[in-house]
């Protein structure tokens, strides 16, 4: 059994805690309620340190996914846990399903899911770390590719515009709309190709990390 590095988690809509889980006794609910009142509502990820513990949050579309961990757990494992919980929660209650639920109304339905995800992340720290590194690599590759694509597109359009203006100055303004349309189609075509490459990279990296098709769920 792995060390208990994650010990309390909740999911809230605004300041309403819909579901929470912990194996420990304490005033977690009241602390969480006060904590939510001061948490930024914008979509983002936050980590706050307090007395050797971290409050790790993922805020998205009005929902807050939070896990309290020991400081030594770092940031990768808590954030990986939150991503897993968010995906699971959205599959079950996405859209309007969780928009009107009352406080703690999902404890019975989803509390055990929080426990399972928590235990999985604590039991598989190496896998979590490898996946985090893989995602970082994919994000870096995507960022570089998109940056280069934008530069190539911009250069091509500028050259074409200059060529048009030199050979036919009177048609320069007329062709602006055509060139914008052409640039949009070029942009979409290349982005679709990049998306396919990125998906292939993600699959290759995940398969290499998990050892083929034997990834644990």
Swiss-Prot record:
Q: Which Pfam families match?
A: Longin, Synaptobrevin
Domain of life of the source = Eukaryota
What GO biological process terms does the UniProt entry carry, in alphabetical order?
protein transport; vesicle-mediated transport
Q: Which residues lie on this side of the membrane: Vesicular?
A: 214-217
Q: Where is the Longin domain?
A: 10-114
Q: Which residues form the v-SNARE coiled-coil homology domain?
A: 130-186
- Bilayer-crossing residues are 193-213
- Give the location in the cell: Endoplasmic reticulum membrane
Function, as annotated: Involved in the targeting and/or fusion of transport vesicles to their target membrane.
* Name of the protein in its database record: Vesicle-associated membrane protein 723
Q: Which organism is it from?
A: Arabidopsis thaliana
Lineage of the source organism?
A: Eukaryota, Viridiplantae, Streptophyta, Embryophyta, Tracheophyta
């Amino acid at each position: 059994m792995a060390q208990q590095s994650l010990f309390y988690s909740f999911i809230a809509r605004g300041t309403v805690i819909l579901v929470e889980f912990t194996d420990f006794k304490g005033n977690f609910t009241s602390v969480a309620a006060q904590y939510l009142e001061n948490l930024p509502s914008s979509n983002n990820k936050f980590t706050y340190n307090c007395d050797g513990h971290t409050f790790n949050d993922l805020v998205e579309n009005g929902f807050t996914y939070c896990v309290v961990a020991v400081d030594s757990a770092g940031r990768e494992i808590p954030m990986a846990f939150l991503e897993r919980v968010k995906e699971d929660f959205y599959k079950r209650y996405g859209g309007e399903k969780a928009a009107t639920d009352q406080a703690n109304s999902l404890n019975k339905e989803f509390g055990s899911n929080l426990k399972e995800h928590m235990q999985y992340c604590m039991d598989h720290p190496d896998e979590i770390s490898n996946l985090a590194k893989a995602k970082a690599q994919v994000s870096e590759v995507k960022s570089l590719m998109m940056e280069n694509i934008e530069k190539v597109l911009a250069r091509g359009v500028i050259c074409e515009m200059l060529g048009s203006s030199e050979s036919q100055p009177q048609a320069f303004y007329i062709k602006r709309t055509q060139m914008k349309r052409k640039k949009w189609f070029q942009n979409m075509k290349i982005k679709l190709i990049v998306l396919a490459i990125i998906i292939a990279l993600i699959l290759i990296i995940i398969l290499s990390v998990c050892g083929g098709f034997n990834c644990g769920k």
